[in-house]
Design a protein with these regions (language model features):
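Structured beta-strand-rich core segments of catalytic domains in phosphoester-bond hydrolases
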Residues: 49-140
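N-terminal, active-site-proximal structural segment of metallo-dependent hydrolase catalytic domains
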Residues: 1-66, 77-85
Length: 140
């Protein structure tokens, strides 16, 4: 039986990180204390695709500035633009081409800012369809 050699473009290193929204009243767990360790970890992992949760726009943009090999998609849950927490997806721009992306609200009205069912706040889901530049394979 022949074994197929796995090529590097067949492997997708995917990570997720709940970065916790910036709450300055959180003392030793505040964003300013956590952010450098997070960047160090992400640089050591070097994920091809990274999903984050709870990122406020300044956190999303900070991460974007520190991960220059990546591009991100995602919007804030409070206005569908920049306000509120983001569930952003970062992907390596030299490995993937973005084909499609969107964010929807987990509610009876998924296409607009809304609170669903028994939730206290808006909840969102961001998705992206990426194409591997080397082989044309697609990944959601």
């Amino acid at each position: 039986m022949a074994l197929k050699t796995i090529e590097s473009n067949d492997i997708h290193l995917v990570a997720t990180y709940n970065i916790k929204y910036d709450d300055n009243s959180n003392g030793k767990n505040s964003w300013n204390v956590r952010k450098d360790a997070m960047i160090e970890l992400l640089h050591s992992l070097s994920p091809d695709i990274l999903g984050i949760q709870e990122g406020l726009i300044h956190q999303v943009e900070f991460l974007d500035s520190k991960m220059s090999s990546h591009k991100y998609v995602g919007v804030g849950r409070d206005d569908g633009n920049r306000k509120g927490e983001h569930c952003a997806i970062y992907f390596k721009r030299k490995k993937y081409k973005l084909l499609k992306n969107s964010t929807f609200w987990l509610s009876e009205n998924p296409d607009k800012v809304s609170v669903g069912w028994d939730a206290a706040l808006e909840r969102i889901c961001t998705y992206a369809l990426l194409e591997n530049i080397k082989d044309g394979n697609k990944i959601w």
